[in-house]
């Protein structure tokens, strides 16, 4: 009887150690960065909110539009590389998991790279403001910890020279590196609503510009 109880006790300890190890390896996605897309006139309140917590501020020129009523973000190769370096360009790894995108695929001739759901990989061009942008499927990838369908749907990465020729609305993308995390996207304690509460507060700041501004909390692998 004693041996049986001892065996159960040892198994229980091993189970706790395994669960603890899995928990430790789980990516909680601490929100140590903010990715904002929109005109500077519309994002002043957001910038002010994080001014004291800001470690590094990166700014990029980007282009936006709509295709089939869905948002399109167009960035050049240099901007895409900056997102890769920050480890916020992610791609589908398995059905429900993702990993960072380490490199861009090779650019096909006379075409830009399209990042979208694999189901739409056969799209050959994206029409924006009456002009067609030839594209080739890159991978099922997005900017941010998880794909935010409300913020972005299609991402086009163009060579720097090609990007200049694409006619679309020009705006700004800001990547804020924060000194202190705003909370975890996958908190250790399920009742931890720190990041959720922050999202509610910041959404109120842009409620009048929801169609013009996109905002995501991101996890930056910060070497800056």
Predicted regions and their residues:
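C-terminal motif of bacterial Sec signal peptides marking the signal peptidase cleavage site
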Residues: 18-21
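Sec-dependent N-terminal signal peptides
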Residues: 7-13
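Basic-flanked hydrophobic alpha-helices used for secretion and membrane insertion
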Residues: 25-224
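Positively charged n-region of N-terminal signal peptides that target proteins for export
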Residues: 1-6
């Amino acid at each position: 009887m004693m041996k049986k109880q001892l065996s159960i006790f040892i198994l229980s300890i091993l189970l706790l150690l395994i669960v603890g190890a899995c928990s430790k390896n789980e990516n909680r996605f601490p929100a140590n960065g903010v990715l904002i897309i929109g005109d500077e006139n519309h994002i002043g309140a957001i910038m002010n909110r994080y001014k004291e917590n800001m470690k590094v501020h990166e700014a990029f020129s980007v282009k936006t539009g709509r295709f089939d009523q869905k948002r399109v973000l167009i960035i050049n190769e240099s901007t895409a590389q900056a997102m890769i370096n920050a480890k916020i360009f992610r791609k589908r790894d398995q059905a429900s998991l993702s990993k960072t995108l380490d490199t861009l695929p090779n650019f096909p001739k006379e075409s830009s790279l399209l990042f979208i759901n694999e189901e739409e990989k056969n799209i050959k061009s994206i029409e924006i403001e009456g002009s067609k942008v030839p594209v080739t499927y890159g991978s099922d990838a997005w900017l941010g910890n998880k794909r935010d369908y409300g913020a972005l749907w299609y991402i086009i990465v163009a060579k720097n020279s090609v990007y200049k020729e694409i006619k679309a609305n020009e705006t700004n993308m800001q990547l804020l590196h924060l000194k202190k995390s705003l909370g975890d996207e996958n908190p250790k304690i399920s009742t931890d609503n720190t990041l959720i509460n922050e999202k509610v507060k910041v959404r109120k700041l842009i409620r009048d510009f929801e169609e013009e501004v996109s905002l995501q909390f991101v996890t930056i692998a910060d070497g800056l």
